[in-house]
Amino acid sequence: MHQTQPSLFGKLMTMFAGFALSGAVLAAPAAAPSATPQVEIKTSMGDIVVELDREKAPKSVDNFLAYVKSGFYKGTIFHRVIDGFMIQTGGFDEKLKQKKTNKAIPIESQNGLLNNKYTVAMARTGDPNSATSQFFINVENNDALNYPGRDGFGYTVFGKVIKGEDVVDKIKGVLVDDKGMFQNIPVIPIVIKSATILKTPIPPKQ
């Protein structure tokens, strides 16, 4: 999914176990980062929880979490919605102003994760190594986006929706229009209110 450009898509705790030795307190090593962190994305149409795959897409996951931790996604909109394809967000505010991003990351599309329905993937320009903050949720199985794709690279999947699939389905069906350089933009803005890492992960579905 092309990244839209201005000119044109339990609880984590640090535990310290120490003991006094000659007046010094020794701390236990911090817990390793979760291999499957979960992020709750609260939108104006409902809440979505995504589970990330750090093992298969480490750079993409760490990049996404950095934006989440900084509060970057608050106030961004779903600026491209195509029923039968995907819903895209993470780059523009309600005034359609593009937000300043961090450095682009390398593509990880050869990780074996597929652009199937309800998976989360990085948006980018024609440059395979141009992904920054924008991401999209596949609303169907999009085989054409898998590596190598039509351009020889495909699109990096780094997670999946594990709660709020109904919200994704509502978003994909909204009325859209073209506005300036934006195509398929919702007529009524769909806004991300917050994106936060869940301290208590949702257990796997039985």
Predicted regions mapped to residue ranges:
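Cyclophilin-like peptidyl-prolyl cis-trans isomerases
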Residues: 2-12, 16, 23-206
